[in-house]
């Protein structure tokens, strides 16, 4: 397993051999006093790497502090096979291939989670695709259908459209019959975003983002999905149509890229920059929002895993689309488990496309 003893750089991603009878746990087992009979132990084949894992390593992820503290094993998603199960678990067999979510703990060769957080592996997924699917898919589903609730024909702007969550948002919007404009930060990402369903793609490295956005939907957007933070939040809000909704699920541009750090360590100068960005993050006035008939919504998926009603509803829809080939993971880049530092560094660079996963060396 990978354990982070304290906040810091890549050297804090400490690999530790896990004995055959040991496992990590999803944090909600103890938080919710979930019974032993309702738990499963999964031998993992792969686990997904998300930007939240990087923030956890830096000590900037609030739910990590609230639910676990230090030391912590990061990770929210995995694929593998059922190794053991409680007596109340009747919907899975020993050895059955599954994928699932956890509240931390997924960077491990063996993890114990509640049965409602594990699902049968779809036939059209391999274990790498499955390990990189759930966190981004659930994030996109919640933002799209629980918060934004667009109507067919709505105009939707998706920042970071080539990323894990962004590519899922594009596909969900397409399934729902919306007009999708995707934003990417580099030319090599344009073709991918077109392939997954964007009607228009804005390459902000080659053209003015907001002039292009206005040309595609002069009347504004019914929904804008923004995980950038201070760099784009105000303009995202300003480009909403009346009745529009800005959905925020991250603040990537507030944080340094790997090229700005030394071995993944945030320098004193970068901490000052983070503080400056925090201070200059737009503040949305409720009176102005009411006058302009616009909304701003934000969420953090790790606080939602205990909502079984949402998990069941979202997974039913997501798996329905997966089985019919309407929803795909896209590009998945695997890294050997012990190369977790490289995976973090590459993700921090902002140059990756799709999802990164760590694979076990059985």
List the predicted regions and their residue ranges.
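Mid-domain Rossmann-like dinucleotide-binding core that forms the NAD(H)/NADP(H) cofactor-binding site
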Residues: 133-207, 211-212
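C-terminal hydrophobic helical "lid"/dimerization subdomain
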Residues: 4, 305-362
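NAD(P)H dinucleotide-binding glycine-rich loop of Rossmann-like/cofactor-binding domains
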Residues: 55, 67-71, 76, 97-162, ...
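Glycine-rich phosphate-binding loop and adjacent beta-alpha segment
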Residues: 231-324, 362
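Glycine-rich beta-strand-centered segment in the early N-terminal region that forms part
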Residues: 30-49, 61-105, 227
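A short acidic, Gly/Pro-enriched loop at the edge of an enzyme's catalytic core
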Residues: 214-223
């Amino acid at each position: 397993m990978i354990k982070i003893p304290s906040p810091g750089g890549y050297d804090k991603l400490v690999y530790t051999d896990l004995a055959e009878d040991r496992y990590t746990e999803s944090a909600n087992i103890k938080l919710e006093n979930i019974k032993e009979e309702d738990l499963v132990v999964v031998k993992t084949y792969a686990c997904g790497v998300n930007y939240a894992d990087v923030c956890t390593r830096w000590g900037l992820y609030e739910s990590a502090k609230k639910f676990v503290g230090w030391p912590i094993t990061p990770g929210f998603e995995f694929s593998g096979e059922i190794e053991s199960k409680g007596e109340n678990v009747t919907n899975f067999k020993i050895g059955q291939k599954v994928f699932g979510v956890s509240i931390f703990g997924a960077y491990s060769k063996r993890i114990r989670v509640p049965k409602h957080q594990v699902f049968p592996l779809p036939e059209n997924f391999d274990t790498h695709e499955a390990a990189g699917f759930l966190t981004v898919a659930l994030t996109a589903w919640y933002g799209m259908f629980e918060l934004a609730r667009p109507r067919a024909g709505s105009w939707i702007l998706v920042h970071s459209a080539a990323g894990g969550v962004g590519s899922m948002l594009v596909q969900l919007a397409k399934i729902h019959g919306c007009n999708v404009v995707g934003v990417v930060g580099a030319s090599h990402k344009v073709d991918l975003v077109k392939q997954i369903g964007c009607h228009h793609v804005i390459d902000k490295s080659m053209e003015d983002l907001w002039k292009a956005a206005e040309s595609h939907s002069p009347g504004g957007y019914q929904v804008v999905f923004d995980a950038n933070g201070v760099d784009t939040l105000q303009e995202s809000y300003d480009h909403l149509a009346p009745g529009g909704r800005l959905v925020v699920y991250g603040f990537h541009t507030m944080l340094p890229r790997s090229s700005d750090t030394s071995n993944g360590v945030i320098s004193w100068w970068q901490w000052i920059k983070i503080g400056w960005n925090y201070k200059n993050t737009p503040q949305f006035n409720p009176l102005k929002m009411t006058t302009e008939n616009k909304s701003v919504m934000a969420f953090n998926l790790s606080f939602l895993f205990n909502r079984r009603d949402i998990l069941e509803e979202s997974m039913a829809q997501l798996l329905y689309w997966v089985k019919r080939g309407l929803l795909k993971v896209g590009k998945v880049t695997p890294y050997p488990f012990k190369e977790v530092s490289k995976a973090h560094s590459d993700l921090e660079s902002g140059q990756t496309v799709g999802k990164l996963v760590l694979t076990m060396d059985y």
